[in-house]
Amino acid sequence: MSKLKKRTFAALLLIVLTTLFSCELNSEDGRWDPMKWTSDRPGDPRKITATAEGGTYQLKCTNYGGPWISSVAAPDTTIFGSSKEQDFRHIKYDWYDVLAKENTFYITLLPNTTGKERKLSIVVTAGDIFDYVEVTQK
């Protein structure tokens, strides 16, 4: 066998062995603990039922550092935190204002004078983990 064939064979063998042994079958990638939330209100912190008078509601993520806003959706519009007009830590539009400050989210709703129920869906992320906050204003 010539030197070139031996080197080519050795290089291919090295590539095959590296490929076989470089990945683990029990890798933890993609297996993230769900976000955990606390609030000063009773019930599920991710489900907010607001009065027609509006107000500010706050919830805190206790197991991830510095989560941010991915998007905020109302029935007529969706705003992404990555858009130029907004910021992934603060989205303000029409009747709502969502602010992420460190691990705490402040959701401020203006008074609902429409007489109709309003809904808001907030997608929160901390990288590869996502969670949802649903807001219903009477």
Give, region by region, the residue ranges found by the protein language model:
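Bacterial N-terminal signal peptides that target proteins for export
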Residues: 2-10
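Bacterial Sec-dependent N-terminal signal peptides
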Residues: 7, 17-45
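Surface-exposed binding patches on compact interaction domains or structured appendages
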Residues: 41-43, 54-106
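Short, solvent-exposed loop/linker segments at the N-terminal edge
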Residues: 48-53
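Beta-strand secondary-structure signal
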Residues: 58-60, 104-108, 121-123, 132-134
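Short, solvent-exposed, Trp/other aromatic-anchored flexible loops in extracytoplasmic proteins
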Residues: 102-116
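A short beta-strand micro-motif common to beta-rich folds, especially ectodomain repeats
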Residues: 114-128
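C-terminal edge beta-strand
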Residues: 128-138
